[in-house]
């Protein structure tokens, strides 16, 4: 609760690798368009011994700004296009079929679904087991600290699972909680 009696809301955009582990994040107030967070996130991550070849995202990231940011860094993207009246989406891109499914070239659908599943898996784990969506501290810096702590726990679980010789538990926050 803020001092004015209004609830302060923040959002976090994070990049997840193909194994479903976070690579980095950036936080902003809830009223900032998520598309504006893509470039700062890529600036922070790309070049720090991290090579990004392909990015998958929801249709909300379909914009020239995002596509230009990815193209300037030589990163391919699998982002479905929204269906808009008066616009015919090219057949070589994914299009949103309904809220969850996409249609388009089969190879892009397979890639998109696999990468989105890893991202959604991380979202589900941190929201259900680490109360990620119940952030109560004030301030954007505290939101960043909250994200860092949550991701430290995610990595700690993976490390402990490896040390125990139980790689099947690397995603199981509940097992170690």
Please identify what each model-predicted range represents.
Residues 33-38, 89-90, 173:
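A short, polar/proline- and glycine-enriched secondary-structure boundary/capping micro-motif
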Residues 46-49, 74, 130, 160:
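Alpha-helix capping/termination and helix-coil
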Residues 59-129:
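Helix-centered, glycine/charged polyanion-binding patches within enzymatic domains
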Residues 1-72:
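Polybasic low-complexity intrinsically disordered regions
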């Amino acid at each position: 609760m803020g001092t004015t009696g209004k609830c302060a809301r923040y959002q976090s955009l994070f990049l997840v690798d193909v194994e479903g582990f976070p690579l980095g994040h950036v936080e902003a107030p809830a009223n900032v368009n998520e598309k504006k967070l893509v470039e700062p996130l890529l600036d922070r991550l790309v070049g720090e011994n991290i090579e990004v070849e392909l990015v998958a995202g929801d249709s909300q990231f379909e914009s020239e700004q995002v596509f230009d940011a990815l193209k300037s860094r030589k990163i391919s993207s699998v982002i479905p296009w929204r269906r808009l009246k008066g616009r015919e989406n090219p057949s070589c891109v994914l299009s949103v079929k309904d809220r969850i499914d996409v249609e388009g070239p089969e190879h892009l659908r397979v890639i998109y679904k696999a990468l989105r599943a890893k991202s959604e898996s991380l979202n589900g784990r941190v929201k259900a087991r680490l109360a990620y969506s119940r952030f109560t501290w004030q301030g954007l810096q505290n939101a960043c600290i909250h994200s860092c702590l949550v991701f430290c726990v995610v990595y700690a679980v993976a490390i402990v699972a490896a040390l125990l010789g139980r790689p099947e538990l690397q995603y199981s926050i509940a097992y170690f909680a």
